[in-house]
Curated annotation (Swiss-Prot):
Biological function: Nerve growth factor is important for the development and maintenance of the sympathetic and sensory nervous systems. It stimulates division and differentiation of sympathetic and embryonic sensory neurons as well as basal forebrain cholinergic neurons in the brain. Its relevance in the snake venom is not clear. However, it has been shown to inhibit metalloproteinase-dependent proteolysis of platelet glycoprotein Ib alpha, suggesting a metalloproteinase inhibition to prevent metalloprotease autodigestion and/or protection against prey proteases.
Pfam families: NGF
Subunit structure, interactors included: Homodimer; non-covalently linked.
UniProt-recorded name of the protein: Venom nerve growth factor 4
Source organism (scientific name): Tropidechis carinatus
Protein family (similarity comment): Belongs to the NGF-beta family.
SMART domains, per the entry: NGF
Length: 244
């Protein structure tokens, strides 16, 4: 009987010694530790995915300067387009810098400085007659280089005029030399021409236009078109019929 009791007690102690240890004392690499590491890695990966999705949904706002530079850089012109240019006008100018206010003694067809299209200057002289002192213009006019964004083409349609172009990684502006009446008056009676006999003629000064070939936008492509610009201030005379 005593031997049986001793045997049962020894078996009970052996069972207690062979019981599994707690998770707090589990060594690295055990199944319990692997489950914990996999769970933490999954949570970290999920956090990274959430952060990336948030950045994609809410991109960082661009600066206004970057947007302006990007819009200017989008209008890229092929240099071959200028080789096909015909009917060049002295009133159309492409330049990286503002042109002089007056053309002076030269009529510039295409302004090229050291950093321009062909690195040369093509100009022609204008022959100005010698004016005597005391001679006056019939109508006073004013001329200046201007930048146009829209204009009327030869078909009467309003077209978009290219203000800036990107050529060989440089930005050029398109200028137009316009001439118009200095003091335009919609009432012909109050804008009589100088030196016209008002007893025989009704006269008034008005601005006239002509067509020049300019670079315009047609859809997403640049193309040459004839557009109207102001080019002169002339005198219009009408014979009075009351005297006849």
């Amino acid at each position: 009987m005593s031997m049986l009791c001793y045997t049962l007690i020894i078996a009970f102690l052996i069972g207690i010694w062979a019981a599994p240890k707690s998770e707090d004392n589990v060594p690295l690499g055990s199944p319990a530790t692997s489950d914990l590491s996999d769970t933490s890695c999954a949570q970290t990966h999920e956090g990274l995915k959430t952060s990336r999705n948030t950045d994609q949904r809410h991109p960082a706002p661009k600066k206004a300067e970057d947007q302006e530079l990007g819009s200017a850089a989008n209008i890229i012109v092929d240099p071959k387009l200028f080789q096909k240019r015909r009917f060049q006008s002295s009133r159309v100018l492409f330049s990286t810098q503002p042109p002089p206010l007056s053309r002076g003694e030269q009529s510039v067809e295409f302004l090229d400085n050291e950093d321009t299209l062909n690195r040369n200057i093509r100009a022609k002289r204008e022959n100005h007659p010698v004016h005597n002192q005391g001679e006056h213009s019939v109508c006073d006019s004013v001329s200046d280089w201007v930048i146009k964004t829209t204009a009327t083409d030869i078909r009467g349609n309003v077209v978009t005029v290219m203000e800036d172009i990107n050529l060989n990684n440089e930005v050029y502006k398109q200028y137009f030399f316009e001439t118009k009446c200095r003091n335009p008056n919609p009432n012909p009676v109050q804008s009589e021409c100088r030196g016209i006999d008002s007893r025989l003629w009704n006269s008034y000064c008005t601005t006239t236009q002509t067509f020049v070939r300019a670079l315009t936008m047609e859809g997403n492509q640049a193309s040459w078109r004839f557009i109207r610009i102001d080019t002169a201030c002339v005198c219009v005379i009408i014979r009075k019929t009351d005297n006849f």
